[in-house]
Amino acid sequence: MSYARIIGTGSYLPDEVITNHDLERLIDTSDEWIRERTGITERRRVAPDQTCGDLAEEAARRALEAADVSLSSIDLVIVGTCTPDRVFPSTACLLQERLGMRHGSLAFDLSAACSGFVYGLGVADQFFRTGAVRRALVIGAETMTRILDWNDRATCVLFGDGAGAVVLDRSEEPGILSTHLHSDGRYQDLLGVPWGPGQGYEKRDALGPYITMQGNEVFKVAVRTLSRIVDESLAANGLEKRDIDWLVPHQANIRIIQATARKLEMPMERVVVTVDKQGNTSAASIPMALDTAIRDGRIKRGDLLLLEAFGGGFTWGSALIRY
């Protein structure tokens, strides 16, 4: 059996920084209120002429440079996003052409909200295990600020824009040890964007093409669910909590991150945290955090990583990876 191993990472943040103090001038909120409840101090926003694909392209190029591989060797591109450039073609197809990749290689988007990158890893891993691909590019990219109601202080303080990417290579030794993916549509109304083009554009103004969230309920389910997936991931591989070197969580909220760390009995010094400077970037948050910790030297070859995410749907998932 063939396995997938990470050989390169990359990330990209747009230039504009929006601080909590900037938001104080827009809505009824405060820097203290935001920091205490979320851990966020600032987030990034795309320029008017930037798209999700632009962010994904920059992250992909940096990951490919780090991996030192040719574009022609990439067999598969998966983009996890809920803010694609177009309804169709997929952002992955657009990116395939923009990067100058081999025509005929496989490219598609995957929509699982904040779990999109972990879902992408899980799907890519199966392509490797069946021997269908030799090399893949998995990306999480989002322009969340484009779907925010800037008058809704419950959501507009949380989200930011960005992209992260990894290059996966075929290996005889497991890099991705296992992935665990789940969803539960019962919770569809707690977090999401209630409008979509399939409902007709005449309904857009009535429903609002913006994120809506019942924050307290989302928090309760997220903490409970992520606790279970920690146990599931470890049990599937015959591992103990002490075996995990690094937790690389979805950067939704510092309180959710801390709750997962407590479940693992892991000190926060072994948890990669970027939510303070980036906010919740949905599917982009995990690959960006991973890239940050690899480039600054915290994560080293041979380290055992637990990636976990939770998002609208609800969707949730984990990936246990030997880096």
UniProtKB/Swiss-Prot annotation:
InterPro entries per record: ACP_syn_III_C (IPR013747), ACP_syn_III_N (IPR013751), FabH (IPR004655), Thiolase-like (IPR016039)
Disulfide bonds: none
Associated pathway: Lipid metabolism; fatty acid biosynthesis
GO biological process, one term: fatty acid biosynthetic process
Function field: Catalyzes the condensation reaction of fatty acid synthesis by the addition to an acyl acceptor of two carbons from malonyl-ACP. Catalyzes the first condensation reaction which initiates fatty acid synthesis and may therefore play a role in governing the total rate of fatty acid production. Possesses both acetoacetyl-ACP synthase and acetyl transacylase activities. Its substrate specificity determines the biosynthesis of branched-chain and/or straight-chain of fatty acids.
Similarity field: Belongs to the thiolase-like superfamily. FabH family.
Subunit structure: Homodimer.
Protein name: Beta-ketoacyl-[acyl-carrier-protein] synthase III
Species in which this protein is naturally found: Alkalilimnicola ehrlichii (strain ATCC BAA-1101 / DSM 17681 / MLHE-1)
Gene designation per UniProt: fabH
